[in-house]
Amino acid sequence: MIEKNINIDIATYIDHSFLKPTATPEDIEQCCNEAQYFGFPTVCVYPSAVSQAVKLLHGQKIAVCTVIGFPTGANTSSVKLYEAQEATENGATELDIMINLGQVKAGSSEEIYNEISAICEATGQTIKVILETNLLTDTEKRLAAEICMDAGANYLKTCSGWFGGATVTDVRFLNNISQGRVGIKASGGIKTLEQAYELIEAGATRLGTSHGVALVQSQNG
């Protein structure tokens, strides 16, 4: 077990996420209030909640992130591009884009590259590509990671949380591929402080979780 007093400020790693399909304006307000109170650098909400989150966090040093093509990645590239541009116009500065898993499985490198690079170029925002590592072989993970880095992504993200969660093995694998070129966002099923520490030790530079408050309280307790 990793010691509780490890020299890590867990709050600074957290993308405070509220991605329940039943999210209400009151839920988004609570999410933003928690981010301010606990010092989370980012909130992650659905595209329909971006404008509200931006207004609530006006003047704060807290980024608003949203998801694109979520959670399956099966939208057409033009739809994803529109989603990304609209989210940017509404104030989002970070975009978590779901990769097209069918294209990864088929080895369609050019299509994947073109989709990600178009969004990177059109928005100029921080781009995190969700690879859904639980559904890919190691060969497919490597292919997807290398294409996304070449296309201009800023982060490789493990999972959407809909098809399993982040593992230490996958974070370490992606970190070894990236060699510091991009950040690694571990996401999905991060509920305990020990999990969080282990993922950070493996190379995660961001943690996407809806349990950020509990993690910080556990560290401070």
Swiss-Prot record:
UniProt-recorded Gene Ontology molecular function terms: deoxyribose-phosphate aldolase activity
Gene Ontology BP term (one): 2-deoxyribose 1-phosphate catabolic process
Principal location class: cytoplasm
Enzyme class: lyase
GO terms for cellular component: cytoplasm
Catalytic residues identified in the record: D96, K157, K185
Reactions mediated catalytically: 2-deoxy-D-ribose 5-phosphate = D-glyceraldehyde 3-phosphate + acetaldehyde
EC nos: 4.1.2.4
Protein name: Deoxyribose-phosphate aldolase
Organism phylogeny: Bacteria, Bacillati, Cyanobacteriota, Cyanophyceae, Oscillatoriophycideae
Underlying gene: deoC
